[in-house]
Amino acid sequence: MSASESEIQARLLAQALPYMQRYENKTIVVKYGGHAMGNAELGRAFASDVALLKQSGVNPIVVHGGGPQIGAMLNKMGIESKFEGGLRVTDEKTVEIVEMVLAGSINKEIVALINQTGEWAIGLCGKDGNMVFAEKAKKTIRDPDSNIERVLDLGFVGDVVEVDRTLLDLLARSEMIPVIAPVAPGRDGHTYNINADTFAGAIAGALNATRLLFLTDVPGVLNKKGELIKQLSVAEARALIADGTISGGMIPKVETCIEAIGAGVQGVVILNGKTAHAVLLEIFTEHGAGTLIVP
């Protein structure tokens, strides 16, 4: 490394110092998903980001998805993927595959990546320590022709109804980094598959997290010119949904951000997981890396 490169790195570290101090002993929940999960180089960059957060005194918690991997495993086993209103129908056979892929395969891959940095990660799902309880999701869809709403039966798709933070508080006082799969039991004894975004929001809300980061395949919320909006209040975000600036798949993402803030999260960021070290750029630099939504 040349002297000039060393000087640049030193300046970057000096600039990061106040942000490291700001987030020391704070909880940051990161929802890991999208393109980054399928790219080995981005996966290693993400793991090193999480490790550096821990080494800087932050309490990072990772929640992950895995929709494409679930679909691939169902195809491999000859089980047809069924969707209602764009949502996966999870029958009894499918929920077993979902749990195997999320809490088994994907979860342990992420744990291994973080452990390779020298930090200690531990793989969990909502069942561990009775951390999360769910109930059958109540979803409806409106027929565009008749304007009549009908209830969707999505099988064992769930909504979070309770989060017990005891285990997560215990891990926060340890050297462990929790990596959590969005699978949880119901009081009825069934296992439920939960949307990873809403699961992460529920975890972050229960912990009154300082930040919740959603790693996506887009830079963040864009204005009508296609430019990144750096910060929005909840009221401004709702107005952009109402006027159509926020549309399509970004609407449920932003609505989840709003719900998380209502549950006690101090700020939620939508950022591009395809950017290497996006987490560090968001947390430890002045301009961040995505769209920050605040109360």
Curated annotation (Swiss-Prot):
Q: Which CDD domains match?
A: AAK_NAGK-C
Its recorded reaction(s) are:
N-acetyl-L-glutamate + ATP = N-acetyl-L-glutamyl 5-phosphate + ADP
What Pfam families does its record include?
Answer: AA_kinase
* Cellular compartments annotated: Cytoplasm
Q: What does this protein do?
A: Catalyzes the ATP-dependent phosphorylation of N-acetyl-L-glutamate.
Q: What is its main location?
A: cytoplasm
Name the HAMAP family on file: ArgB
Provide the binding site for substrate: 66-67, 88, 193
Q: Provide the GO MF annotations for this entry.
A: acetylglutamate kinase activity; ATP binding
Q: Its Enzyme Commission number?
A: 2.7.2.8
Q: Could you name the domain of life of the organism this protein comes from?
A: Bacteria
Pathway per the UniProt entry: Amino-acid biosynthesis; L-arginine biosynthesis; N(2)-acetyl-L-ornithine from L-glutamate: step 2/4
Q: What is this protein called?
A: Acetylglutamate kinase
Q: Which UniProt keywords apply?
A: Amino-acid biosynthesis, Arginine biosynthesis, ATP-binding, Cytoplasm, Kinase, Nucleotide-binding, Transferase
State the InterPro entries in the record: AceGlu_kinase-like_sf, AcgluKinase_fam, ArgB, Asp/Glu/Uridylate_kinase, Glu/AcGlu_kinase, NAGK-C
Q: Name one GO biological process term.
A: L-arginine biosynthetic process
Gene designation per UniProt = argB
Database matches in SUPFAM superfamilies: Carbamate kinase-like
Site described as Transition state stabilizer, positions?
31, 253
Q: Which GO terms describe its cellular component?
A: cytoplasm
Spell out the family assignment given in the record's similarity comment.
Belongs to the acetylglutamate kinase family. ArgB subfamily.
